[in-house]
């Protein structure tokens, strides 16, 4: 599984590019997190293996996205594109995706980055798990650096304020300021599905680390306390 993924990345993309390297390591971490959560939930061994594979492949669309556009989240929906790639026979063979697992893989990859799951998949355990694992690693990455926004103001947009107080994740297009970005990070916690993911988040202390890196901490204290 990992060997095929490494060959795919190293043979098709420039690993010297920091963005490619970052997505490669993110994919491996999410795979490890996915396995850890599935094991904690006492899933059958085959389901643990599938969750691990989905974690590894969830961002496969990111590599082409960066190579083509040199940016993320502007011109391509990488979840939808990743599912499109994995639906191809050559990718199915490359990553040894079992025919009876294929729809689970496609659904999990397609919907991992959407604002919410459709009603038909709201109880799908693989879709729920990959969204948890991905968010946990995104929060980890954000805890390791300062938040940077072109609009560096401590002003919360009306739409972001409304979504945050409803207890929902924040729509990306609504994020316009530094303050919006901070709340959008915190709101990721609202969409975590499994108690064990929340336990990991607490044990790793990521939210407090993000708070420690903030500008104008007092402005955000009540929002962090709410989480």
Description of each model-found segment:
Residues 14-18:
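Glycine- and acidic
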Residues 1-13, 54-60:
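Short alpha-helical hairpin
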Residues 20-28, 32-44, 57, 68, ...:
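Divalent metal-dependent phosphate-bond-processing catalytic cores, especially two-metal-ion Mg2+/Mn2+ enzymes
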Residues 42-53, 92-111, 122-129:
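Acidic/histidine metal-binding catalytic segments
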Residues 29-37, 76-91:
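An active-site-proximal "capping" alpha-helix that borders the catalytic cofactor pocket
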Residues 48-74, 78-82, 86, 103-115:
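His-Asp-centered metal-binding catalytic motifs of divalent-metal-dependent phosphohydrolases/nucleases
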